[in-house]
Amino acid sequence: LDRQARTTLDIDLASADTDRLRLVAAAEPEEQTLDVALDHLQELASLDLGDYFSFVIAKSRELATAPEGGLRCTVECRVGGRRFTNFRLDFGLGDPVVSEPEWVASRNLLAFAGHEPVRIPLLPTEQQIAEKFHAYTLPWHDRANTRSKDLIDLMLLFETQTLDQHVLKEALRATFSHRNTHPLPEHLPPPPDDWSSEFAEMAIRFRLSVSTLAEAYSYLQDIWERWELGVA
């Protein structure tokens, strides 16, 4: 999405293949699947690629939002042995991925040091949209839903990306079924009215084709119905 996208404060990693982690954990009586996942992350972070960067996972805690658990880690990035910055990394286990990852090339920030851009696998756009719809429709029984940013992200993705309708339907079915928090809705529920002001501000900032919350809901509801996204 380039400069039109919402910026993020963390890096999200996902692993659909939890069987191997469970096998390793089962072989070690003291190990749990999340412990094995953390060990694997530490091992990957310690790889020396000859670029003078190193990464240390300083601390972690369990993340309950992933279907089979996850970790939220604070990672310290060092350059030439000195601390450069810290960032947050969320690692989730068990989300289904119904199509091949999308590979993108990073910006060539280290060209001055003779390093080529790296290629990064991303979750398919349809999978990202399915997870956004899941978060958007998730019932918040104990407090008000404040995730207006999910609606912004959905608008940006639908307006800027070429999508496969059938892959999106499959991703929605798989995500709602696997997470098993609430049913895939037949009709898209409207957003809370108190999102209106914040949404209008973000709609201008991200140059959406709509300017109001009602227009955004109408846009997404139309796609939901035409593509029959709520039909299991």
What are these model-derived regions, one by one?
Residues 2-6, 15-232:
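Structured mid-to-C-terminal alpha-helical surface segments
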Residues 9:
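Periplasmic plug
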